[in-house]
From Swiss-Prot:
Keyword Aminoacyl-tRNA synthetase appears in the UniProt entry: no
Segments for region (Disordered): 1-20
Residues recorded with modification Phosphoserine: S157, S292
Assembly and binders: Interacts with transcription complexes SCB-binding factor (SBF) and MCB-binding factor (MBF). Interacts with SWI4.
This protein's GO CC annotations: cytoplasm; nucleus
Protein name: Putative transcriptional activator MSA2
Entry keyword set: Phosphoprotein, Transcription, Transcription regulation
Record gene name: MSA2
Length: 363
């Protein structure tokens, strides 16, 4: 908005001297005055439109004058030719330049700050990106050290693990485990193999002639066959069979153990050496082996008459003429041999039954 100050007003003038003046008419004379005093033309009130003009409109808007006649009526006259004002000077965008410059300064400042931030972030990223590269380059020569032992331990090659020429510790353990099973004589069908060996004619001939002598030699002459046993402990070849529950848990009583054999260190076996005496002892032990199915023997009372029971030597008697022409054993001889393997000791010699009897008597 452009504000203009009004200049000094001139009365009784028909035309205004400036475009920004307000001309007012004098006070009307009373009616009692002479008409000669009313001969003059009534001055007009000229209102400049420039004072009412709003900033931003065009300068073609005309200027009007308001005149009051003798009769007291006001009339609007046409536009008066007034010198045009310099709107270019008034409408100079001087205040607009200042915000433009300030905006530019702010924009440049913001851009410079953004550039600085980008530069800082790039430098930081470069620093962090360079650190792992240096660490990896420093670790690479350490990993590829000239010492062969460290490199083999850290990075073992898969070919060496899979090669059969250089077995691992696991393969060695497996080999030792299988050899240990072979040394102990582990066989799944042991009962069937023993029966086949027992029914052969060679074993029957040896067992009929030297059954008692083989048992005694096996008990007293185990020192001669120490290299055949893995832990110097012979098989149980005695005809004593125990059918009590305690004997099933511990089939070999403590009285039958040979402490000197158990305390001795283990020795290496020699399975390739042929020993007839060992084979005969094994055959005798297979003869006296009890069957796989459980069997409950009759317990002889302590106060009973032994004359009522048959002598146990009858069970040990084997028919010499029991062999058939083909060399196979008859059913009678087989039954007699199986009965001889089921001979039970008297109650006084059975530790388990004595212990049970003591418990019952205490109750």
């Amino acid at each position: 908005m452009v504000y203009t100050t009004p200049q000094q007003q001139q009365r009784f003038s028909s035309t205004p001297q400036s475009s920004h003046t307000l001309i007012f008419s004098p006070i009307r004379a009373p009616s009692m005055q002479t008409p000669s005093s009313l001969d003059y033309q009534s001055p007009s009130i000229v209102v400049s439109s420039s004072s009412m003009k709003v900033h931003g409109r065009s300068s073609s808007f005309g200027k009007f004058s308001l005149s009051i006649g003798q009769n007291g009526k006001a009339t609007i006259l046409g536009p008066i030719n007034v010198l045009p004002t310099d709107t270019s000077k008034m409408e100079k965008p001087v205040p607009k330049k200042k915000p433009v410059t300030s905006d530019r300064v702010e924009k440049t400042r913001i851009l410079s700050l953004l550039k600085k931030m980008r530069n800082k972030s790039s430098t930081v990223n470069k620093k962090y990106s360079k650190v792992p590269l240096k660490s990896t380059t420093s670790l690479q020569p350490a990993a590829t050290a000239p010492s062969p032992l460290v490199s083999n331990i850290i990075k073992p090659s898969p070919k060496k693990l899979a090669s059969p020429r250089t077995p691992n510790a696991n393969s060695n353990l497996n080999l030792n485990f299988t050899s240990f099973q072979i040394k102990t004589g582990f066989t799944p069908n042991l009962d069937g193999i023993l029966l086949e060996n027992f029914t052969s004619p060679n074993t029957t001939a040896d067992s009929q002639g030297n059954s008692a002598s083989n048992i005694i030699n096996n008990n007293h002459g185990s020192a001669n066959n120490t290299n055949q046993f893995l832990f110097n402990l012979p098989l149980q070849s005695s005809p004593r069979q125990f059918r009590s529950p305690a004997r099933l848990i511990d089939p070999l009583p403590i009285s039958d153990w040979n402490t000197s054999l158990l305390m001795s260190p283990p020795r290496t076996t020699n399975f390739e050496s042929a020993n007839n005496h060992f084979n005969s002892n094994f055959a005798q032990a297979s003869m006296l082996r009890r069957p796989s199915l459980p069997h409950i023997d009759e317990v002889i009372p302590q106060d009973s008459n032994p004359a009522n029971y048959s002598d146990r030597s009858d069970y040990l008697s084997v028919d010499q003429n029991a062999n058939n022409h083909n060399g196979a054993l008859s059913e009678q001889t087989y039954n007699n041999i199986m009965k001889s393997s089921m001979i039970s000791l008297p109650i006084e010699k059975d530790d388990a039954t004595m212990a049970l009897r003591k418990l019952v008597s205490r109750e």
